[in-house]
Amino acid sequence: RSSDLFGSLVKQYHLKQTADRADWLIGEGLLAEGINGKGLRSMSEPGTAYDDPLLGKDPQPAHMKDFIKTREDNGGVHLNSGIPNRAFYLAATAIGGYAWEKAGYAWYDTVCDRNLAQDADFDAFAKLTIAHGEKRSGSDVGAAIKQAWEQVGVL
């Protein structure tokens, strides 16, 4: 989810954290006392944010092989967001440094791109992030982004 990604970047910027120092958690501290979990979602390890008898287990997949096909949640847009979230985490940590400086710009440029269709699938989105990463930051960044999407099974 773009909101997860950009929220995480704002937090990292505020804390002056490099990609390898960030916790990559969304909603940490929001779970009630006694709930077994560290947050609502994990960008680094989707599906591991919580596992509790009351809440159940974090359902987010980290790889396309576990993609959830459903009519609920607008086709699983929130459930399956663990896949692109993990791709961003992998790209940002592979590139190194501050995630907002290179990987973040590639994703930002992608969501601002008029060529990004409203109903774009992960494949189309991934290809645009690679192109924007290369355009703004060079072929090494584009290659790291491509490898991240390959690692989560999108490409």
Region spans (language model):
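Zinc-dependent metallohydrolase catalytic domains
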Residues: R1-L155
